[in-house]
Amino acid sequence: MEAEDEYSAGCSFSLMCQEDSTDLDDDGGGGGCFAGDGRADLLLVYNAAAAADDEDEEEVEEYMDHLVSKESSFCSSSSSTSSSSCCFSDAGGESAAAAAPMDWFALARRATVKWILETRGCFGFCHRTAYLAIAYFDRFCLRRCIDRSVMPWAARLLAVACVSLAAKMEEYRAPALSEFRAGVGDDGYEFSCVCIRRMELLVLSTLDWRMAAVTPFDYLPCLSSRLRRHVGGGGGAGASAALIFSAAEAASVLDHRPSTVAAAAVLAATHGALTREALESKMSGLSPSFLLDKEDVFACYSAMLSQPTSPASKSTTTTTGKRSSSSSCSESTDAASSYDATAASFPAAASCGSKRMRLELPGGILR
């Protein structure tokens, strides 16, 4: 047991680059966004947006052009396949694409995304870490076949590996693999350190080791600042984050570009429900050189507002579609805490299951 514990403790760092911690620990050892309740990254969004007001316009343009260029390069190779063509098979080996609609996969994916968000709250990860983990999961599912018969636990194992890899990419201190517990009640699973590490390597090889993707959270500071300067508003980073994750829970994050998701989230969080004409008018103030597909933004925006968990869909709007300032402030606060509230129940669910299954990755399950 002691040997296994020592091995488990070292596994979380086996895939990490050796970096100089002096470049990372700018907060005097506070642990960055790893510590606390996970809202430090939202504070950074507010601070960055405020600082952007005083920055040279050309620098902001250059930064956003860089993001768009990186995003375009990444999307062209990572999401050339539609999410509707995911490769899954049922217990009898029949292709799910030729069978009935994959409601079972939609349910499994939704449960996986919820678990990733709960885990983010439990460990205090920044929002970008959670979004990257979801993106890894969706990209993996485009390239690998998963048997339906093993989907519940195979999807959870994949989620653990994706969260672990995302944490190693983004967090100052990544948890040891032994710290990840994917249990839910008495039906939970406890994966060995070796099993998680194997899945990590499978994810890395499947994604061609391209892990540093652009996310909607990279755009939020600039978009929020621009929206505030040109058309008013632009705050509500918490509401924007909740909208982004609400959309990620409902459909693959590969369905829309990160810039599209960020623009839709900022507009929905700031203005609530708008007509198409009003939305396009607000979009014109985001950036003259920021090439946004209006059709795509409107589709993503509408999808966000249609989700029952969306904070913007619950808002009370005036006839012109604008929320009152008091309503906006209240909902922004609620949205900022909606995805952190599950952290209180997650540790209990992860530790109370007395009936655990210790699973190793069998051959032939993922191919």
From Swiss-Prot:
Region of interest called Disordered, as start-end residue ranges on this chain: 307-333
Gene Ontology MF: a single term: cyclin-dependent protein serine/threonine kinase regulator activity
SMART domains: CYCLIN (SM00385)
Pfam families the UniProt entry points to: Cyclin_N
Signal peptide: none
InterPro entries xrefs: Cyclin, Cyclin-like_dom, Cyclin-like_sf, Cyclin_N
GO cellular component: cyclin-dependent protein kinase holoenzyme complex; cytoplasm; nucleus
GO biological process: cell division; G1/S transition of mitotic cell cycle
Keywords: Cell cycle, Cell division, Cyclin
Entry's family note: Belongs to the cyclin family. Cyclin D subfamily.
PANTHER family: CYCLINS
Protein name: Cyclin-D5-1
